[in-house]
From Swiss-Prot:
Gene that encodes the chain: relA
Pathway field: Purine metabolism; ppGpp biosynthesis; ppGpp from GTP: step 1/2
Any one of the GO BP annotations: guanosine tetraphosphate biosynthetic process
Catalytic activity: GTP + ATP = guanosine 3'-diphosphate 5'-triphosphate + AMP
UniProt source species: Mycobacterium leprae (strain TN)
The keyword Transferase is assigned to this record: yes
Name this protein carries in UniProt: Probable GTP pyrophosphokinase
């Protein structure tokens, strides 16, 4: 510790305060000539001292110093150099996961804060923010060397690192800490900058830790940056987290945005030119620019609002920066004179700032080509605040100080920010630490409420949610079977709106056929509840149509005096379904039930498939004899597999694993005397090997007539006509689809599975690439089972 103190004394900053008062004892003022000479000497000494000060700044600090000087030209940065040396010495033996010296992290955090325009005290705290937690440097020693203010900031960041938002057991700790931070928000700003650099270098951590940190960033840190008004930091945190948590979806969004770039840029250039021309004619000085696109925001709008990519307005956005507030309102008039404003889309955040920080005018108009165009209009000062939030706010407060040094009471002035005031109000009003913690955590989620299950679990819902929304948030089946609700111990109507902090209990029906009511669609507000209810009724209609179709087919076959079970078998119906352009047999039955095709027509196609009534009767009789069935093997049934020592034995490729040439295979003798061919890694291998006497060797022997069953799975961002585009891509490659299934998850990811026959599996790689190029598809691969 003594060595540290010695270093600190050697690097004690030279205080340079301009004006004659400092040099008065050395400056005679008897004559004008003498005074002029003395002034030259003072300037020379000041120049030498400033040169000496600059020479003590480490080269690695020069970028930070250059940025900070833009905001605080007269700042004395000697203390920053001293903090860097202490941090460098304390972290000397430590490395980051990337292999870089640990000091690169606090230095990067300080650089981020310098770019935000934070004061010297914050930069010093940033350089030292990990020394107390990760080295033997005590908080007392740090405070003694750099002052109580720096010590307070470092202590706040250290405590924030030691707790996990959301743990009720830590409620009291977080309550005290957040209250302290509300009085000095720089602690929060340092933490946000710390997380931003960690997210930028997250690739060096294990995947599971990356995912945990990214999830915490999305749920807590990014909303915190949003509440602090730090938009530029918030966007970057969200996009970095998105790339870690959903890499394939992230890449697909990036690809989609890049694909629209040329047409979008042309469109924006046309819009900018028109706005600039009209503003000039109206004598309004302003800068017009395109707004950057943020991938997480685009993805969220696709999920939460259920929009297709092409319908997202944010892809085309304009920002107008004016000199004066009155010009902002005049600019709105200009924009509305050019294009028709959309009803309900004008918001005045200048008159009513959001969170007490953000100010801007928002409007959406029907722009050229009938496309929605989002426009933000603000002053340049408002724009700096919008980008840097409380950091910019703090910078303006600091401007009242001297040489960038914090005014002792400046922190109190931050209390004019609404959200910071709210934190202090919660501290006073919350009866329990857990109550305060919940107020903090869930207020970070804009336009959401939190309610509790009977067991005390927290469920977050959109504002205006009902018990039905709550039921679906708990589980889909709870939602489907919901018949009543009790809120805070009292029975309530299902359409009653829930409020923050309420305890909700759902009563469910035990009836096997229980389901949602169509009336629910009129009052539920959560996307999940709306989707699940809509899916239930769609599935119910499909199931009813499917059963009606089967009944109609049975009646029609019996009317013709034909054997139902033998005629309506999977192979024959699948052939007719393909001929009539249905993706599978179930779709054909559903079409019959819905009246799109008649049962009589389908039976006629079945008979034609079998060569007429006479041939059909003969064919059906032949199928009924197992021995005849084994002998019957047309050339088109060549599966490309031979059994050594047993030529002519009927072989069949197992549908449970759909082997193709190149796969390791094994044979299993069926009870009918044929051989079922499985992949050696088939999910049924373990059970088959329990009957080892029935396992035989088989070899691939494909010929030009061999046909193989292949199943692929396609994962894509759901959109209109997605299935059509995928099936069209397969059809263009002359692929005959035997079956297809599609499911859509709550986050608008469509998972499709297709089963088809291929003559040469070597072409599968090319086929997968073709499907992968369909818009919205981010992954496609072969799967084992065709079922």
């Amino acid at each position: 510790m003594a060595d540290d103190q010695g270093t600190a004394q050697a690097l004690q900053p030279v205080q340079v305060v301009p004006g004659p008062a400092v040099e008065a004892p050395e400056t005679p003022v008897e004559t004008l000539k003498t005074s002029s000479s003395a002034s030259r000497r003072v300037r020379a000494r000041l120049a030498r001292r400033m040169t000496a000060q600059r020479s003590t700044i480490s080269p690695v600090l020069e970028p930070l110093v250059a940025v900070h000087k833009e905001f605080y030209p007269k700042a004395n940065l000697s203390i920053v150099q001293r903090a860097f040396e202490v941090a460098d010495q304390r972290h000397a033996s430590q490395l980051r996961r990337s292999g870089d010296p640990y000091i690169t992290h606090p230095l990067a955090v300080a650089n981020i804060l310098a770019e935000l325009g934070m004061d010297i005290t914050t930069l010093v705290a940033a350089l030292l923010h990990d020394t107390v937690e990760d080295t033997g440097y005590t908080l007392e020693a740090l405070s003694e060397e750099f002052g109580d203010e720096v010590g307070h900031l470092v202590d706040g960041v250290t405590k924030l690192d030691r707790v996990v938002l959301g743990s009720a057991a830590e409620g009291e700790t977080i309550r005290k800490m957040i209250t302290a931070m509300a009085r000095d928000p720089r602690v929060l700003v340092i933490k946000v900058a710390d997380r931003l650099h960690n997210m930028r270098t997250m690739r060096f951590l294990p995947p599971e830790k990356q995912a945990r940190k990214a999830r915490e960033t999305l749920e807590v840190i990014a909303p915190l940056a949003h509440r602090l008004g730090m938009a530029s930091v918030k966007w970057e945190l969200e996009d970095l987290s998105f790339a870690i948590l959903h890499p394939k979806k992230y890449e697909e969004i990036v690809r989609l945005v890049a694909g629209r770039a040329p047409s979008r840029d042309t469109y924006l250039a046309k819009v900018r030119a028109e706005i600039i021309s009209t503003l000039g004619a109206s004598k309004i000085k302003a800068t017009v620019e395109g707004r950057p696109k943020h991938y997480w925001s685009i993805y969220q709008k696709m999920i939460v609002k259920g929009r297709d990519f092409d319908d997202i307005h944010d892809l085309v956005g304009i920002r107008i920066l004016c000199d004066e507030i009155r010009d902002c309102y005049a600019a709105v008039g200009v924009v509305h004179s050019l294009w028709q404003p959309m009803a309900g889309r004008f918001k005045d955040y200048i008159a009513q700032p959001r969170y007490g920080v953000y100010q801007s005018l928002h409007t959406t108009v029907v722009g050229p080509e009938g496309k929605p165009l989002e426009v933000q209009i603000r002053t340049r000062d408002m724009h700096r605040t919008a980008e840097y939030g409380i950091a910019a706010h703090w910078r303006y407060k600091e401007a009242k100080g001297r040489n960038g040094v914090l005014h002792p009471h400046a922190a109190a002035e931050i209390d004019d920010m609404a959200w910071m005031r709210q934190l202090l109000d919660w501290q006073r009003e919350a009866a329990e630490p857990g109550e305060f913690l919940e107020s903090l955590r869930y207020d970070l989620a804009v336009q959401e409420i939190f309610v509790f299950t009977p067991k005390g679990d927290v469920i977050t819902l959109p504002t205006g949610s009902t018990p039905v929304d709550f039921a679906y948030a708990v589980h889909t089946e709870v939602g489907h079977r919901c018949i009543g609700a009790r809120v805070n111990g009292r029975l309530v109507a299902l359409e009653r709106k829930l409020e923050n902090g309420e305890f909700v209990e759902i009563f469910t029906s035990k009836a096997p056929n229980a389901g949602p009511s169509r009336d629910w669609q009129q009052f539920v507000v959560s996307p999940r509840a709306k989707t699940k209810i809509r899916q239930w009724f769609a599935k119910e209609r499909r199931e009813e149509a499917l059963e009606a179709g089967k009944d109609a087919m049975a009646r029609e076959v019996r009317r013709g005096g034909l054997p139902l079970q033998r005629l309506v078998n999977g192979e024959s119906m699948a052939a007719v379904a393909r001929e009539l352009h249905y993706i599978d047999v179930s779709a054909l039955y559903t079409a019959i039930g819905e009246g799109h095709v008649s049962a009589r027509h389908v039976v006629q196609r079945l008979l034609a498939e079998l060569g007429g009534i006479d041939q059909a009767e003969e064919e059906l009789a032949e199928r009924s004899t197992p021995t005849t069935m084994l002998r019957r093997q047309r050339s088109t049934d060549d599966v490309g597999v031979s059994v050594p020592g047993a030529p002519g034995v009927l072989t069949k490729l197992a549908k449970c694993c759909t082997p193709v040439p190149g796969d390791a295979i094994m044979g299993f003798v069926t009870r009918g005397g044929g051989v079922s061919v499985h992949r050696t890694d088939c999910t049924n291998t373990a059970s088959l090997q329990q009957q080892a006497e029935r396992i035989i060797e088989v070899l691939w022997a494909p010929s030009s007539s061999s046909v193989f069953l292949v199943a692929i799975q396609v994962e894509a961002l759901d959109r209109h006509r997605l299935l059509l585009d995928i099936t069209r891509a397969l059809a263009d490659e002359r692929v005959d689809i035997l079956s297809a299934s599609v499911t859509t998850s709550g986050d608008r990811v469509a998972i499709s599975r297709f089963t088809f026959e291929m003559g040469d599996p070597k072409h599968l790689g090319h086929l997968l690439n073709v499907v992968r190029n369909v818009e919205g598809v981010y992954d496609v691969y072969r799967v084992m089972s065709a079922s």
